[in-house]
Every structure is written in structure tokens, then in C-alpha cells.
Amino acid sequence: MALPKDVKKVVLAYSGGLDTSIILKWLQTELGAEVVTFTADLGQGEELEPARKKAEMLGIKEIFVEDVREEFVRDFVFPMFRANAVYEGVYLLGTSIARPLISKHLIEIAKKTGADAIAHGATGKGNDQVRFELSAYALNPDIKIIAPWRDWTFKSRTDLLNFAEQHQIPVAKDKKGEAPFSVDANLLHSSSEGKVLEDPAVEAPEYVHMRTISPEAAPDKATVIKVGFRKGDACSINGVEMSPATLLATLNNYGRENGIGRLDLVENRFVGMKSRGVYETPGGTILLAAHRAIESITLDRGAAHLKDDLMPRYAELIYYGFWFSPEREMLQALIDKSQEHVEGEVTLKLYKGNVMVTGRESEKSLYSDALVTFEDDHGAYDQKDAAGFIKLNALRLRTLAKRNLNK
């Protein structure tokens, strides 16, 4: 796609790393545009002040470095976990759910600064380009979007390094060769892809895992915690109320120490190819188990099964980048309605990579001791009623059987 030539000012999603620093300078030299940078603190665990200083060094006048951790967990992660969203049976969507938040801030900053375009550093092979751009267009249909990886003429890492040297962009010594794999991280998870991970038959090296210790190295004694919920959202750990971001960070610590949340998967990208990734979602893995457990005693069977039926579609919408679509918002309204009575506390045992639910309690529980007891239920349930229930449900099966036996 040809570069827009009428761009005067562009907001760049800027990490401060080599690639986005090269993109920054490329936007200045190729488009002659004024560049505004946006760096988000999503809980990736990196000091962000160097990104500000690097942007200043590259001549940027308008620099936005924002702590969005609470917004990320409260408005994006928690709504997603109310749905128990999992893509292709295993992926907890840690990268996918961060992209609409970044796009939202890019659009807001573009409006604030009078920019007519935004830019991102996603490659032309991945899902992130789609997620960034669908989200941006949903919020501003007239915004111009620049994706340098699809447009520039660099063919190799050497070309990038030569450009960096030509424009006096600092290059760390460990960046002069190919990185062994690429990493994306936020408060929910970290993902590692590419290079040493491209052969799906070969086990990932241990050094790839940065958020969790190996289950083999985890403590020999289990850790027991209690997670409290209110209207479907986790609100406390061991009775202590916490903000959304603090709660998730605390669960991450418990998960990391017990080797929880590792995932090696091959997923189907939206753009059509399969990719292998090594993901770590320690806190999210605990949160999902706890949320399903509290739902098990507070959700009606019909509501629970309907949620499970809809979940794959909801997860797919997030994975594909349709967070701001009307269908995702419609599903969210239904999901949020289901969470009105999802409150209580879940007890979990964490041990060597495993999350085991050992207890759940709620004032809104639908679990009845009187109904399920093996002892005298004092008339709460008349077992004779089951005969008619079974006969009615068997009617169509018996009718089919009679027809088939008479062939």
C-alpha cells in the first residue's frame, strides 16, 4: 500500500527499542512528518523513562508515557475473564487483549495533538497489525494508519542496523546480532516467538521462560490462597481487597513461584498461517480456574452452558481484533448480565505448575446440601419423580428405536 503523502503529524506506538526507534526516524525522513510518541506502561516490567529520554534525543517534542495498568486490567482483562475466554482451547489472549487499549490511546492522543495519522511497529505477517488497525478504525474511521514493516524497503537486519548507524540511533551491543526470539509482555502475560522457537518439534530452551520458574524447580510444599469475587471480577486475595492491577500482579507472583501458566502452542493466526509460541500467563491461569469455580456454584445450569457455547466466538472476536465491534459488545452485555450473582471466595492449591480448586463458597450459591445429601433429605427431593422425567426424555429415543427395529 502506498504511503500517504499528506501526513503532517503522526502518533507512533513507541517502545523505545531499536525497531520503533528506527520507525520513528524513518517517519521523519520518509514522510517529513512531525512525530508524537506514545509509550504505554502495561506492566511489561520495563523501565519506561529510557523510552522518554530516547525520544527526546531523537528530537521528539510531544512525548506521552502513560501508566495504563489499572485501565488495562479493569476495562479489558476483567471483562474478558468474565467470559472465561480461551482461544483454540488453550490461549488466554494476553497479547490480543492489549492491542485495543493501545489503539484507543493512540486515537485519543491523535485528537489531542491534532495528528492526522497513527503508526505501529507490527509486522505484515502477524495478527497485531490487524488488531491495531481494526481498533483504530472503529474509533476513528478517517484516521490514516502507517505500518512501516509493510511499506519500507529494508530487506534484512543489516539494513536496519545500517539505517540506525546512518541516523545515529543508539544500538545496544546485544542487538547487533539477531535476537534469539521476540518477546511481547504485559501484566497478563508474556509471549515469545520466532527464531529458536520456529521448529514446533523442538522443546523451547529454559531461558525462554522469563515469568515463571520451571515446575520441577517449584517448592515441594503447596501454596494455598483464597481469591474473592464480586459481580464476576476478582476483588481480593486472602481477604485483602486490591485494585485490579495489584490483584493480577499478586497472582502473577504466586503463579511464578509455583511454575504456573506455561504454554507451548501452535495457533492459527487470523492472516492464515500457523505459528508456534511459548506463552506465560501465571496470574491469568489462576484467575481463570478461580472464576470458573465460583461460577460453578452461582450460575444456573442453562446460563452456564450458554456462556460456554458463546465463549469460543467471543474469544475469536478478541483474537481477530474485533474488541470494538458491535457483536463483541452485544456478547459482553449478555456475559455481564450473567455475572450479577457471581460472588464469593474460592480456595486454590498451587503446586508445581498445577492449580487445584479445593473449595468454593458464596452467599449467592445455588448448591443445596439438602438436595444432594446421601442421607435423609426430609422430602426435599422425591426420587420417584425421576421415573416420569426419564420416561418423557426417553420418548423420542424409544420412538426412533421402534422405527429402526422394524426395518
From Swiss-Prot:
Pfam families: Arginosuc_syn_C, Arginosuc_synth
Coiled coil spans: none
Keyword terms: Amino-acid biosynthesis, Arginine biosynthesis, ATP-binding, Cytoplasm, Ligase, Nucleotide-binding
Record has ATP-binding as a keyword: yes
Residue sites binding L-citrulline per the record: Y91, S96, N127, R131, S182, S191, E267, Y279
GO biological process, one term: urea cycle
InterPro entries: Arginosuc_syn_C (IPR048268), Arginosuc_syn_N (IPR048267), Arginosuc_synth (IPR001518), Arginosuc_synth_CS (IPR018223), Arginosuc_synth_type_1_subfam (IPR023434), AS_cat/multimer_dom_body (IPR024074), Rossmann-like_a/b/a_fold (IPR014729)
Binding site for ATP: A13, Y14, S15, G16, G17, L18, D19, T20, S21, A40, G121
Residue numbers binding L-aspartate: T123, N127, D128
Enzyme Commission number, as recorded: 6.3.4.5
Cellular component annotations (GO), alphabetically ordered: cytoplasm
Family to which the UniProt record says this protein belongs: Belongs to the argininosuccinate synthase family. Type 1 subfamily.
NCBIfam families xref list: argG, PRK00509.1
Protein name: Argininosuccinate synthase
